[in-house]
């Protein structure tokens, strides 16, 4: 199974790239983690945010291969504990499809992305900087994988 993280924003700080790649490399070949970056629309004083969100949404959805299971990362989504995420990861594997996780920009996800998603995951009730979300998602998925494989990374 491949997990595709589709995120708005490019040119992240070095610590984000380093952190994400650290967890990305730990996954086995049969559980690949891929990052697809979508350029953020230009925001300014008079920016049309609805138009920017729409364009970002179109680009995100175009980056997702047909047949992928789509999960939006969104505040109204479900929160999962590590064991619950591990169970979810197992379900995704049994489903036989690759998974695309969507991370929006500063204003969140386009309505089209929310509608395309069959699940919505709330990473935290806290407001997190979008670059940090990439690292937290990668670590959380790795931890869930380690629970499922009895790897010593996760400790109760």
UniProtKB/Swiss-Prot annotation:
- Where is it found, in Gene Ontology cellular component terms? cytoplasm
Q: Which residues bind S-adenosyl-L-methionine?
A: 73, 104, 123-128
InterPro entries, per this entry? Alpha/beta_knot_MTases, RlmH-like, tRNA_m1G_MTases_N
Report a single Gene Ontology molecular function: rRNA (pseudouridine-N3-)-methyltransferase activity
Cited Pfam families: SPOUT_MTase
Q: What class of enzyme is it?
A: transferase
Q: What is its main location?
A: cytoplasm
Determine the domain of life of the protein's source: Bacteria
Q: Which UniProt keywords apply?
A: Cytoplasm, Methyltransferase, rRNA processing, S-adenosyl-L-methionine, Transferase
> E.C. number, please?
2.1.1.177
Q: Which reaction does it catalyse?
A: pseudouridine(1915) in 23S rRNA + S-adenosyl-L-methionine = N(3)-methylpseudouridine(1915) in 23S rRNA + S-adenosyl-L-homocysteine + H(+)
Where found, per UniProt?
Cytoplasm
Q: How does it assemble?
A: Homodimer.
Biological function: Specifically methylates the pseudouridine at position 1915 (m3Psi1915) in 23S rRNA.
| Family per similarity comment | Belongs to the RNA methyltransferase RlmH family.
Spell out the protein name for this chain.
Ribosomal RNA large subunit methyltransferase H
């Amino acid at each position: 199974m491949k997990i595709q993280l589709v995120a708005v924003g490019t040119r992240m700080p070095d610590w984000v790239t380093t952190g994400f790649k650290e967890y990305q490399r730990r996954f086995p070949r049969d559980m690949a983690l891929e990052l697809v970056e979508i350029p953020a629309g230009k925001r300014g004083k008079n920016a049309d945010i609805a138009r920017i969100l729409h364009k970002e949404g179109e680009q995100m959805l175009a980056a997702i291969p047909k047949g992928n299971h789509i999960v939006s990362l969104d505040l109204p989504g479900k929160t999962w504990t590590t064991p619950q995420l591990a169970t979810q990861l197992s379900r995704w594997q049994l489903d036989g499809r690759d998974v695309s996780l969507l991370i929006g920009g500063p204003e969140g996800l386009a309505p089209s992305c929310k509608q395309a998603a069959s699940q919505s995951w709330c990473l935290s009730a806290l407001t997190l900087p979008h670059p940090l979300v990439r690292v937290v998602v990668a670590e959380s998925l790795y931890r869930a994988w380690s629970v499922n494989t009895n790897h010593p990374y996760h400790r109760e």
